[in-house]
């Protein structure tokens, strides 16, 4: 294990992360809200700590192995998540505890969107901007992690995807170097953010709200600058724009890369991808169920309102954004539970969405269908085909391994919450909301996590990390084998 090289890289990451504090400091200066001091202070603290880690080890540039890569990825999220809590700790408004500061920071960076802060409308603009910007920064990190780094380490949804499944993604000549891949993804991510911000502004948002919500929309984070979330704007146009950009962001970013690289975006190009087709099918099915049941129960006086709310909440929850326009927990009980379960599927591999990813659910479904056929014809040989090509058994085994680990982590976290005194419904939905990086839950955590006890919040922080790091990245560090030389 190249510890000095790892410390050098972490120091460099801290120094680079310190620069992100300048943006909210400028917002504080622009709006004169008096909230700039926490960010300037944090900038110098992180820059100093980063330099202290980097400078003594600057000449240690040994070749890193996969074990070093796992540790660096985990340290990226834990160190930056911890560093991101400093402005919340230093700021007078909001005046929150150490636990709440860490919870808010990790929730933002992992794009979970669960918040402990109430009274968002009264907060300084700089703090509001920082929460949104932290989600956007985390979203970019997620894309680079999922598309460029985890496949190199041999894990993650994209590893299965790019290795075995035919279609546009496998045929795409993604740049081989991580730095070049990250640069290409950065341009796409930034372009989508600008387009989203302009669309929100044209639909009636203020420039501040438009930029802030474009950050959390493209990152599929779900943070808002208002307690009422997207319901604050009460606009069909804004709801529709949010839906469109959430769907785009929940798609595999290598599909976007392939589309841009080919010189034009064509629907047929996306439709060749089996995961994309499955994703759209799931979205349409969920929307129809929600819309028809809302009509049946007369939840809204107008069918247009029912259509708007069903579409928005379906996409928002199932892609794990967690934006709300209405108290969806007050819908007929079946619907919020259905949408909560849909977050277990989440977005596509290589997207900013959370959950287990559509590609894994697709492979699990095909595996289940194969087992049913085997019961009828025990001696027959069946292969799982995706996009016309048969998948080797090791791919199916990898998916089942992930599913088993996911279930284990879920149960352990849920039992941990119940042990702290949380009721069963709230514990189940809180773990679902954090492990799937969704945000809002049901019961005690339907609106916010401010009333959750401190011990439970630390369990949920760990749950967020497990969800964002696709279980195995963090789980492997807990095995004795990893630390043996």
From Swiss-Prot:
Q: Which GO terms describe its cellular component?
A: plasma membrane
Residues reported in the UniProt entry to bind K(+): 111-112, 220-221, 320-321, 437-438
Q: Which residues lie on this side of the membrane: Periplasmic?
A: 30-35, 116-124, 203-205, 225-234, 325-332, 420-421, 442-453
InterPro entries named among the record's database cross-references: Cat_transpt, TrkH
User: Could you tell me the membrane topology recorded for this protein?
Assistant: Multi-pass membrane protein
Give TM regions. Answer: 3-29, 36-57, 66-90, 125-150, 178-202, 276-296, 392-419
**Pfam families linked to this entry:** TrkH
Region of interest (Selectivity filter part 4), residue spans: 436-441
Annotated stretches, region: Selectivity filter part 3:
319-324
Please tell me where the chain lies in the membrane without crossing it, as residue ranges: 98-109, 110-115, 206, 207-218, 219-224, 235-250, 303-318, 319-324, 333-344, 345-357, 422-423, 424-434, 435-441, 454-465
Keyword list, A-Z: Cell inner membrane, Cell membrane, Ion channel, Ion transport, Membrane, Metal-binding, Potassium, Potassium transport, Transmembrane, Transmembrane helix, Transport
Q: Does the keyword Cell inner membrane apply?
A: yes
**Location within or outside the cell:** Cell inner membrane
Listed GO MF terms: identical protein binding; potassium channel activity; potassium ion binding; potassium:chloride symporter activity; protein homodimerization activity
Annotated stretches, region: Selectivity filter part 1: 110-115
S-S pairs: none
What does this protein do, in the record's words? Low-affinity potassium transport system. Interacts with trk system potassium uptake protein TrkA and requires TrkE for transport activity. Selective for permeation of potassium ion and rubidium ion over smaller ions such as natrium or litium.
Q: Which family does it belong to?
A: Belongs to the TrkH potassium transport family.
Q: What is this protein called?
A: Trk system potassium uptake protein TrkH
Species: Vibrio parahaemolyticus serotype O3:K6 (strain RIMD 2210633)
Which gene does this sequence derive from?
Answer: trkH
């Amino acid at each position: 294990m190249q510890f000095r090289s790892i410390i050098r890289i972490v120091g460099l990451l801290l120094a680079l992360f310190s620069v992100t504090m300048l943006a909210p400091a400028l917002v504080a200066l622009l709006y004169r809200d008096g909230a700039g001091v926490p960010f300037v202070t944090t900038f110098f603290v992180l820059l100093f700590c980063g330099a202290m880690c980097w400078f003594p080890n600057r000449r240690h540039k040994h070749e890193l192995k996969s074990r070093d890569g796992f540790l660096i990825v985990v340290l990226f999220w834990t160190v930056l998540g911890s560093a991101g809590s400093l402005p919340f700790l230093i700021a007078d408004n909001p005046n929150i505890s150490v636990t709440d500061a860490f919870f808010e920071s990790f929730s933002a960076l992992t794009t979970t969107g669960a918040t402990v802060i109430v009274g968002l409308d009264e907060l300084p603009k700089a703090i509001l901007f920082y929460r949104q910007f932290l989600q956007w920064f985390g979203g970019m990190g997620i894309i680079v992690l999922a598309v460029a780094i985890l496949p190199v380490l041999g894990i993650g949804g994209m590893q299965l995807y790019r290795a075995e499944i035919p279609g546009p993604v496998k045929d795409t000549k993604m740049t081989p170097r991580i730095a070049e891949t990250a640069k290409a993804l950065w341009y796409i991510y930034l372009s989508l953010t600008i387009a989203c911000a302009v669309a929100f502004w044209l639909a009636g948002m203020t420039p501040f709200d438009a930029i802030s919500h474009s950050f959390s929309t493209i990152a599929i984070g779900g943070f808002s600058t208002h307690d009422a979330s997207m319901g604050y704007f009460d606009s069909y146009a804004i709801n529709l724009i949010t839906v469109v950009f959430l769907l785009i962001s929940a798609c595999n970013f290598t599909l976007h890369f392939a589309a841009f690289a080919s010189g034009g975006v064509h629907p047929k190009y996306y439709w060749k991808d089996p995961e994309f087709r499955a994703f759209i099918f799931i979205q349409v099915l969920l929307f129809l169920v929600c819309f028809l049941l809302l009509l049946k129960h007369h939840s809204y006086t107008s069918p247009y309102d029912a259509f708007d709310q069903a579409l928005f909440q379906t996409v928002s929850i199932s892609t794990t954004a967690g934006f709300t326009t209405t108290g969806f927990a007050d819908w007929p009980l079946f619907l919020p539970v259905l949408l909560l379960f849909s977050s277990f599927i989440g977005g596509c591999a290589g997207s900013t969405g959370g959950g287990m990813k559509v590609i894994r659910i697709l492979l699990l479904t095909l595996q289940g269908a194969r087992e049913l056929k085997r019961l009828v014809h025990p001696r027959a040989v069946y292969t799982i085909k995706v996009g016309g090509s048969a998948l080797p058994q090791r791919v199916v085994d990898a998916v089942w391994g992930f599913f088993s680990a996911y279930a284990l982590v879920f149960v352990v976290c849920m039992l941990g919450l119940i042990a702290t005194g949380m009721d069963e419904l709230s514990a189940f939905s809180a773990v679902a909301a954090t492990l799937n990086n969704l945000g809002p839950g049901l019961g005690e955590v339907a609106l916010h996590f401010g009333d959750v006890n401190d011990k439970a919040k630390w369990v949920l922080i760990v749950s967020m990390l497990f969800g964002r790091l696709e279980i195995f990245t963090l789980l492997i560090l807990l095995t004795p084998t990893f630390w043996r030389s």
